[in-house]
């Protein structure tokens, strides 16, 4: 997943142009809650920020995802990963995402936008029947409140917008201007200490779960 290996040289010029065109369209007119991060030197390395949907345990989080195009794309689906740690039935320990769109339901005319929207939908409606994280799948089916609490806690620890710099909406997070810092420096230090203490406590709770 973290490999620097690229398949650019194995993709046809037509496929590269098609992918680049779609990414640029998404950058100009982004889907709600999704911000694509274009790597112009390697179109096979596609990353995006997805806002956690409201009303889910992932709300208020920002999740970085990665799509890896193989040499046979679009005849074969890309692999998809969460780079941000997440507690979800359809996400493996290494971040790999399991969704039918990227397996038996794949069609060559499904684009990057469709894949990212499908991943966002997976945050709203997980599929515990095809779980890669069996613990999360079982917990969702049998003890939803515990599942929701665990997923929320992971979101608060690992998916805070400050870790990504911006949210998928494009708004800067925790980026105070010089004048703000001048007047609020002490308050910010106190808040940071409180946040750090809270995160440590949550991590201890996670270990006990």
Curated annotation (Swiss-Prot):
The protein's matches in Pfam families, at most eight in alphabetical order, are given as:
UQ_con
Alphabetized CDD domains for the sequence: UBCc_UBE2S
For the UBC core domain, which residue ranges apply? 14-160
Offer an example of a GO molecular function term for this protein.
Answer: ATP binding
Q: Which SMART domains match?
A: UBCc
Give its E.C. classification number.
2.3.2.23
Q: Answer whether the UniProt record assigns the keyword ATP-binding to this protein.
A: yes
Name the pathway it acts in.
Protein modification; protein ubiquitination
Q: Which residues cross the membrane?
A: none
User: Which stretches does UniProt call biased (Basic residues)?
Assistant: 200-209
Q: Which family does it belong to?
A: Belongs to the ubiquitin-conjugating enzyme family.
Name by which UniProt lists this protein = Ubiquitin-conjugating enzyme E2 S
Q: Which organism is it from?
A: Drosophila yakuba (Fruit fly)
């Amino acid at each position: 997943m973290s490999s620097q290996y690229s398949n650019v040289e194995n993709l046809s010029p037509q496929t590269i142009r098609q992918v680049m065109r779609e990414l640029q369209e998404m950058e100009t007119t982004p889907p709600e809650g999704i911000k694509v991060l274009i790597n112009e030197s390697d179109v096979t390395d596609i990353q995006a920020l997805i806002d956690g949907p409201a009303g889910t345990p992932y709300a208020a989080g920002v999740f970085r995802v990665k799509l890896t195009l193989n040499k046979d794309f679009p005849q074969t689906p890309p692999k998809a990963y969460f780079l941000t740690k997440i507690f979800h039935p359809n996400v493996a320990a290494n971040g790999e995402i399991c969704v039918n769109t990227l397996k038996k339901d794949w069609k060559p005319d499904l684009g990057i936008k469709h894949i990212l929207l499908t991943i966002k939908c997976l945050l709203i409606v997980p599929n515990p029947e095809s779980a890669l994280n069996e613990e999360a799948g079982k917990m969702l089916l049998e003890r939803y409140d515990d599942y929701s609490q665990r997923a929320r806690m992971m979101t608060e620890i690992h998916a805070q917008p400050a870790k990504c710099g911006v949210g998928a909406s494009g708004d800067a997070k925790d980026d105070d201007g010089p004048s703000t810092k001048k007047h609020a420096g002490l308050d910010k230090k106190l808040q940071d200490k409180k946040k750090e203490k809270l995160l440590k406590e949550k991590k201890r709770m996670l270990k006990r779960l």
